[in-house]
Each structure stands twice: as C-alpha cells, then as structure tokens.
Amino acid sequence: MRYFHRTSLAPDRVLELAAAHFGTRLAPAEEAPRRRAYSGTVGRVTVTARPEGGHYTLVEVATDQVGESEIDRLAKRFLAEVHREAEPTHEIRGAY
C-alpha cells in the first residue's frame, strides 16, 4: 500500500518522527538522504520525505503488505502524527 501526505514540516523533521515512530517497533533496514526503511515480522515500511514547491514536504509511506494489515495501521498512524506535529490542535481519531 502507498499513502501520501503534504505537510509544512521540513523533510528532516519528518524523518526524525519516522525514526521515533517506527524505530521502537521495527528494525532499521535502509537509510538514504530523504528516505528511511524499517522492517520486522509484520512487514516492511519505507518513508520518503522530499521538498515540494514552496514550503511544503511531500511524505510518502509505502508498505509491502495489503491494506488494513498491522504495518498499514502503523503507517496511517504515523501520517496522523505528522499532521498533529504540524498542527497541534489536530485530533487523531482513527482506530489505528
């Protein structure tokens, strides 16, 4: 599955959040300047954060599992946390 989100956070901040979110549950699998990957028994997730026109960052999260798997719920939760970091009043409501 692939998920996308546009944020006002800097790419480096998004990757810091990814390390904090996925690093406690999954092992680091790949590190590149704008990309991080983590893997474990539940699957593999790749986070890409790249600057996009103006002051925005495009965040792409891809997993190697089908939708609604455990790793997909982790991916969606991560994007909700990125949104909350950029907008602290955002309330996370999903069951993930």
Predicted regions and their residues:
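Terminal, regulation- and interaction-focused segments at domain boundaries
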Residues: M1-P28
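Short, hydrophobic/aromatic-rich segments at coil-to-beta transitions
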Residues: E30-Y38
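Conserved short-loop catalytic and cofactor-binding motifs
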Residues: R2, R35, V59-A62
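Hydrophobic/basic alpha-helical segments enriched in Actinobacteria
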Residues: L26, Y38-T41
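Beta-strand/loop substructures that line and gate deep hydrophobic ligand-binding cavities in soluble
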Residues: T41-Y96
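Amphipathic alpha-helical interaction segments
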Residues: R13, A29-E30, T46, A86
